[in-house]
Regions:
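P-loop NTPase motor domains
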Residues: 1-220
């Protein structure tokens, strides 16, 4: 995270194997982008924003080609659904995308979340979009968008061969710690799965974690 242009790329979407993984990703993102000690007076906005994000992630996971399954595309979809005029009742390009999905697969899990998000008035929907955009605003940066567009880490291989993975966090900037939190969570999940379901209970190569300031810098 110190020099993103020199880093190996990491795309969390690559490690989504089932619906539970999608839920865990969204939950972890919201948790890790919430300042420590803060408490929302009205959880409605975060809950609704998470439903919108779940709809978008599920859509990409099941409907988009692999090269479009990333946070950069999430930002494109969010912009495509932006409500500029609360009096304009015409469907947005994002609405039309989900309308097409409803025609072909009305029971799609992405639609279930999109319907839940879309049940409010235009003013409410606009506020929900703003809430989600605020959570994801770092992905507007070209450096972070590029870092997370593809994946070069191959996390399960850490338990199969000798390799060292360094996650370097700036000492004076916690802006991108949320991505490291997601990385840790997905790494644990991948290694647990590989040990339990592929290698008979233990990894071929033991994995050791040296995590300085882990409790202070990340949330799982």
């Amino acid at each position: 995270m110190i020099s993103m242009e020199k880093s190996h790329c990491y795309n969390p979407f690559v490690y989504l194997q089932n619906d539970n993984d999608v839920q865990k990703l969204v939950t972890n993102l919201f948790k890790s982008t919430t300042p420590k000690g803060s408490q929302s007076q009205d959880p409605f906005w975060d809950t609704s924003a998470s439903m919108l994000l779940l709809a978008l992630v599920f859509y990409l996971h099941y409907e988009a080609p692999e090269d479009e399954q990333n946070f950069a595309m999430i930002m494109e979809m969010l912009r495509a659904g932006a409500i500029e005029d609360e009096e304009d009742t015409r469907p947005s390009p994002l609405d039309e995308l989900f309308a097409e999905l409803e025609m072909s697969n009305p029971d799609h899990i992405a639609l279930k979340y999109y319907r839940s998000y879309h049940s409010g008035a235009a003013k409410t929907l606009k506020s929900i979009q703003i809430t989600l955009a605020a959570r994801l605003e770092k992905f507007n940066l070209e450096s972070l968008a590029s870092l997370t567009t593809t994946d070069e880490l191959d996390l399960p291989s850490l338990g199969e061969k000798k390799v060292a993975l360094f996650a370097l966090i700036p000492d004076n900037d916690s802006s991108f710690n949320f991505l490291v939190s997601i990385l840790y969570t997905q790494l644990f999940q991948q290694l647990f799965y590989a040990a339990d379901h592929i290698h008979g209970g233990s990894l071929p190569v033991p994995v050791h974690f040296l995590m300085d300031e882990f409790a202070n810098e990340t949330q799982l």
